[in-house]
Amino acid sequence: MSAVSRRNVLRGGLVATTAGVVAPGTVAEAVAAADGASCPAPPGPAMVGHGDRRYRSLASRGYNRRVVGEPEHVWVVGTTAHVVRAAQQAVDSGGRITVRSGGHGFENFVADPAVEVVVDMSAMTGVSYDPARRAFAVEAGALLGDVYRRLYLGWGVTIPAGWCADVGVGGHILGGGYGPLSRLMGLSVDHLYAVEVVVVDRRGRARAVVATREPSDPHRDLWWAHTGGGPGTFGIVTRYWFRTPADGDDPSGLLPAPPAGVLSFQVSWDWEKLDRTSFARLVRNHGAWAEQHSAPDSPYLALYSELALTRRPSGTVFMIGQVAADSGAERMLDEHIAALNRGVPVQPVRPVRNQAWLAAALAGSPGDPGPVYRLKVKSGYLRRRFTDRQIEALHHHLTRTDYDHPGGGVSLYTHGGKVNTVAPDATATPHREASIKMF
């Protein structure tokens, strides 16, 4: 797994690291021909430079306003053939190239001063069923909300992916794809059948390759690399195909069906009433619950929560989440809160709301202010709960008085369940024993 780098931004062009990529032939022309034959002309290709009125909108489209890049130009693309052209131009000119889908990357991998060319995927948003592959094709510029809506309204299915509806599919899937349904259904990449990716071979030729999970596919290692290897690492993804391993030709049976409804909740504890002891007990209880219910046979897989340990000046420690409404949701939530609050002398406030699943999926995480953040983050996975010493360090930094800004904190997401049924080497996402995801 160490060969897969999540931080490897391609320098001077896209170089494929997989031997199977250099086989002759290309699918770019076929894809372009199919697009042109069945659809209106797509936008692009357009190479937008500093003198173009669109430049500022495209260059500053990132979620994290702490980092804003100034590339020489941004390519607006509408087809795989356009992406091939953009990649070839970057290789020929020697310019450093990267790619942006939804713009939710927290680091400066796109907004790096060294980046000269950005390929903007936001016009490639198609979602359709591909009968030839018995899989759902999703273009890399589609937002999660669009994917949820089209898959659910069209076929009654979904992929288990993130909670923020305006996250782009392109980078999200390449990080594994985790969200509120993952404990029930696994990661997005556990349902990834194929990927179309523009690479550059050893002769400096940009071209599109389709790699599948089929054992006989000579490009299978390229598929594997895209099941958690990180965005922009091996090429520019233009399209994904999703299908849960299943037989039959009925699209409604080829991906999981989400619950009809969910119980959404937001629970809060008043910081003024939490002392060092009660804070430690709350965090310890949460860790114990997450460990106990991370196994694939837990009766609580339908429950997903995020405990946000915010700084004391913010006023509250809070927990958000949802429970599949067809699983005894009220009882399950009551038991979850009771377990976390055991021995904590503070009664939490707990507003809840019953919602149709699609409405909840499109609404996203409660309180998300949208693309207005300026932040630095780090994430990780925990097999076991925090130690008492670690909890003490958390409390110290969340309550210290020499820094009075309310921003900052640690969020703990329940993990495991179906995610942990997959072998660590089956995909490029090796974290298959975790009980908590930390952010």
Where do the PLM segments sit?
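FAD-binding subdomain of flavoenzyme oxidoreductases
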Residues: 161, 166-270
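N-terminal secretory signal peptides and thylakoid transit peptides that target proteins
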Residues: 1-17
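Loop/turn elements at helix/coil->beta-strand transitions in domains of secreted/extracellular proteins
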Residues: 92-96, 114-115, 154-158, 233, ...
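Glycine-/small-residue-rich beta-strand-loop submotif within the FAD-binding core of flavoenzymes
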Residues: 65, 110-139, 180, 184-185, ...
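C-terminal region of N-terminal signal peptides and the immediate post-cleavage residues
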Residues: 19-37
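Cofactor-binding catalytic cores of oxidoreductases
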Residues: 36-63, 102, 107-110, 252-439
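Short, structural beta-strand-to-alpha-helix junction motif
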Residues: 134-138, 142-152, 168-169, 353-357
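Glycine-rich N-terminal segment of FAD-binding domains in flavoprotein oxidoreductases
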Residues: 52, 63-124
